[in-house]
Design a protein with these regions (language model features):
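Flavin (FAD/FMN) cofactor-binding and adjacent substrate-gating region
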Residues: 3-29, 105-110, 134-214
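Extreme N-terminal leader/targeting segments of oxidoreductases
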Residues: 1-54, 72-73, 77-78
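Glycine-rich Rossmann-fold phosphate-binding loop(s) that bind the pyrophosphate
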Residues: 58-62, 84
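C-terminal catalytic lobe of FAD-dependent flavoproteins
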Residues: 3, 330-449
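Glycine-rich active-site loop/strand segments that organize a redox cofactor
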Residues: 90, 94-124
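Helical element adjacent to the flavin cofactor pocket in flavoenzyme catalytic cores
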Residues: 161, 168, 193-253
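Active-site substrate-recognition segment that forms the wall
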Residues: 138-146, 231-233, 238-241, 249-289, ...
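Glycine-rich FAD pyrophosphate-binding loop
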Residues: 71-94
Length: 456
């Protein structure tokens, strides 16, 4: 690799390939979920040279689950988990906090034709939610984790037609749901904006930054977590792999990549991932008078009927706020700062369309969060090269699918077997992206916004 470090930079092990990592997450400090929590203690930063049994790169849902499961299955093993930021400020702590059992976009007519495939995907996601539910309960993690389900809501005729397709899809796979008319929507949401909704009961809502912070602090004792430790170089070997950070290194015979859209920077999956940033804004805490004027339920999550519409959370953990999330942008390098104000202007319009009586309530935080898609919707799971394993690209179902894929990857590494593992291994691989991918994403995003209309 051009410009790569030499063997002498990595110590005494023999390596087949050295690589300078050339793609990094760059996050600002305006993640509302993180900022409304108590300040973190100073992190443990990787310093010096560490040798262990496993190195896991990436402290999101997949990395946390993989590290935990490796530690559970091999209590005598030493596991190093490395993240380039603080847990909670990374991508895992920047989502809307929908821990879903089936994808939001089951609206397609063709979905009902793939009954067995859809039911298998839902079972896989629910296994991830069950593992999280068990872990959160066992360690008493305070993160607002509650099985409230999710609402899919429409505000236009087009949106109502999409809800009809969604209901047909749910009927075809024997999934239960409840339909709300306009009056019921107003009663639940505190606004007359929505004309119809479907409530799917099996998803969870969560404060994502609080959850991943709790998952990190409750890791087994044989997991060493290092934060603010960006991996800058990697050496792949026949016997050992070594990763370097600014102040240290970690070497292990087995390397686990839980790096999602940044995996390209480590030399894998070139031109196969679509890196996006989705944007959200959160109000300041509502006053008692504002809450009374708003009415509605104190906590809920809304997914727009149209895929390009606005997601909404009314949040009570740790306090009373409203979050709106819409629009996405293409970015390999997590350029959050320059586009944050652009996103906030769009969110302000969406917020005031829904709650004009709260027009004076300002946003306190606006931020972006990275996610990764593949063009054909397939994930990456398994061995990327000898003794380098990866679970990457969860296509918008990161909390559930990222968790179960990290758990299953750990089980695969140590030789555990299960039907779920076979299902994961049987999945396809991402196909190659089309030329001018970034331009295509931008055109697609603009077209979707225009079609979404009032539902944005």
């Amino acid at each position: 690799v051009s410009g790569a470090p030499s063997d002498s930079d990595f110590g005494t092990y023999e390596y087949e390939e050295h690589r300078k990592v050339d793609l990094f997450p760059v996050y600002d400090q305006n993640n509302g979920w993180q900022e409304i929590l108590p300040a973190l203690a100073e992190p443990a930063v990787l310093t010096g040279d560490v040798t262990c049994d496993y190195v896991v790169i990436g402290g999101g849902y997949s990395g946390l689950a993989a590290a935990r499961r490796l530690a559970e299955l091999e209590p005598g093993a030493s596991i190093v988990l490395i993240d380039g930021d603080r847990i909670g400020n990374n991508a895992a702590g920047r989502s809307s906090g929908f821990a879903i059992d089936h994808a939001h976009n089951l609206r397609a007519r063709s979905f009902a034709d793939a009954r067995a495939q859809a039911q298998a995907a839902i079972a896989m996601n629910r296994a991830g939610l069950d593992y999280l539910d068990q872990t959160i309960a066992e360690h008493n993690i305070d993160c607002g984790w509650v099985r409230e389900g999710k609402y899919h809501a429409a505000a236009t005729d087009r949106g109502e037609r999409m809800l009809g397709h969604f209901a047909e899809s749910l009927d075809a796979i024997d999934e239960d749901y409840t339909t709300l008319d306009a009056a019921a929507c107003a009663h639940v949401f505190g606004t007359s904006f929505y004309t119809k909704a479907i409530h799917a009961p099996h998803s969870y809502l969560v404060q994502p930054a609080a959850m991943v912070r709790g998952l990190a602090t409750s890791l087994p004792e044989n997991v060493s977590l290092f934060e603010d430790s960006m991996v800058t170089d990697v050496a792949y070997g026949t016997r050992m792999h070594t990763v370097k950070t600014e102040r240290g290194s970690a070497s292990a015979p087995i390397l686990v990549m839980a790096t999602n859209g940044f995996t390209e920077g480590f030399g894998f999956l070139q031109k196969q991932l679509i890196p996006l940033i989705t944007w959200g804004s959160m109000t300041r805490e509502l006053t008692p008078d504002e809450s009374d004027r708003l009415g509605g339920d104190p906590s809920y999550g809304i997914i727009a009927a149209h895929p390009a519409g606005t997601s909404v959370r009314r949040v009570t953990t740790p306090d009373n706020r409203i979050l709106v999330r819409n629009i996405f942008s293409f970015s390999k390098r997590s350029d959050f700062v320059t586009r944050r104000h652009w996103a906030a202007k769009t969110h302000r319009k969406s917020f005031e369309n829904r709650w004009p009586k709260l027009a004076a309530v300002p946003f306190e935080h606006s931020w972006g969060g990275a996610l990764s898609l593949s063009r054909n919707g397939e994930p990456v799971f398994g061995e990327l090269r000898p003794n380098v394993y990866g679970t990457v690209v969860h296509n918008g179902v990161g909390i559930a699918r990222g968790t179960i894929s990290g758990k299953l990857l750990a089980e695969m590494i140590v030789g555990e077997d299960s039907d779920l593992l076979h299902q994961m291994q049987a999945k396809g691989r991402p196909n190659t992206n089309l030329p001018f991918q970034d331009l295509g994403v931008r055109i697609n995003a603009r077209a979707r916004r225009l079609i979404a209309g009032l539902e944005e």
